[in-house]
From Swiss-Prot:
The lineage of its organism: Bacteria, Bacillati, Cyanobacteriota, Cyanophyceae, Synechococcales. This is 5'-nucleotidase SurE. The keyword Lipid metabolism does not apply. Disulfide bonds: none annotated. Its EC number is 3.1.3.5.
Length: 269
């Protein structure tokens, strides 16, 4: 295989073990690797951008494997990708990788994931992009996740991988030896019991910590292969999940399923 130009980011920051393992795995296969990632933890920032303050970037090659070019950026994961693609990287990447996230990115949680947002920036620019997450905060199979991410992306990029499709890979919290087979999956719909812990600062003013817990995982009902398991169900079976995601959120159901609206004596149709 000819070497690929690979751009890597994450939302856990430049010091995270996951991104360093992924970058090392890509470099070990002979690819040209550039890392542009946040200089600190930026989890759950979604696709947010920094517009009210400057974005700074500093070289961080010493934190990564030999041959990896790295930048630590003061912005969000989406900022990092934009800065990389339009300012820091000389040549357009062949592949964008985001991760390895310290924790799962399953179901509709992808909407708040900085890891998925970084990969989505690549997808929006017409670059094949894959997000990869270790589906546990304690058990982190980073090497196994990195190897699988590279196997999947190297094969997919030479296969039928549409430009507008992001691949979201989650690795189960188990040893590689007992891990089941990889399958294509659907996004589940995650429902939370949103809880806030209210406290007082030394001046008596209230502040809050968000501490929601998942209470339900529902099967999605959209178009697509009906025999695919949900990503959550796949992880519960100790099997890796691979979910295709596209940036087009447009609803494609029948017109009759939409709310009937009438404004100024005219029906909306």
């Amino acid at each position: 295989m000819a070497p690929l130009r690979i751009l890597i980011s994450n939302d856990d920051g430049v010091f995270a073990d996951g991104i360093r393992t992924l970058a090392a795995a890509a470099a070990a296969r002979g690819h040209e690797v550039t890392v542009v990632c946040p200089d600190q933890e930026r989890s759950a920032t979604g696709h947010g951008l920094t517009l009210q303050s400057p974005i700074r970037a500093e070289r961080a090659d010493e934190l990564f494997a030999p041959g990896v070019t790295a930048w630590a950026c003061s912005g969000t994961p989406a900022d990092c990708m934009k800065l990389a693609l339009f300012e820091l990287v000389k040549h357009k990447p062949d592949l964008v990788l985001s991760g390895i996230n310290h924790g799962p990115n399953l179901g509709t949680d992808v909407f708040c994931s900085g890891t998925v947002a970084a990969a989505m920036e690549g997808t929006l620019e017409g670059i094949r992009s894959l997000a990869v997450s270790s589906a546990c905060f304690q058990w982190r199979q980073f090497q196994a996740a990195a190897d699988l991410a590279m196997d999947v992306s190297e094969q997919a990029i030479h296969g039928n991988w549409p430009e507008n499709m992001l691949l979201n890979l989650n690795i189960p919290p188990c040893a590689k030896e007992v891990m089941g087979p990889l399958r294509w999956t659907r996004l589940s719909i995650r429902r939370y019991d949103e809880q806030f812990s209210s406290r007082k600062d030394p001046r008596g003013r209230a502040y809050y910590w968000l501490a929601g817990e998942v209470v339900n995982d529902l099967e999605s009902a959209g178009e697509g292969p009906k025999d695919w398991p949900s990503d959550v169900a796949q992880i519960h079976k100790n099997c890796p999940s691979l979910t295709p995601i596209q940036p087009d959120l447009f609803w494609r159901g029948p017109l009759g399923d939409l709310p009937q609206l009438k404004l100024n004596d005219q029906s909306v149709h």
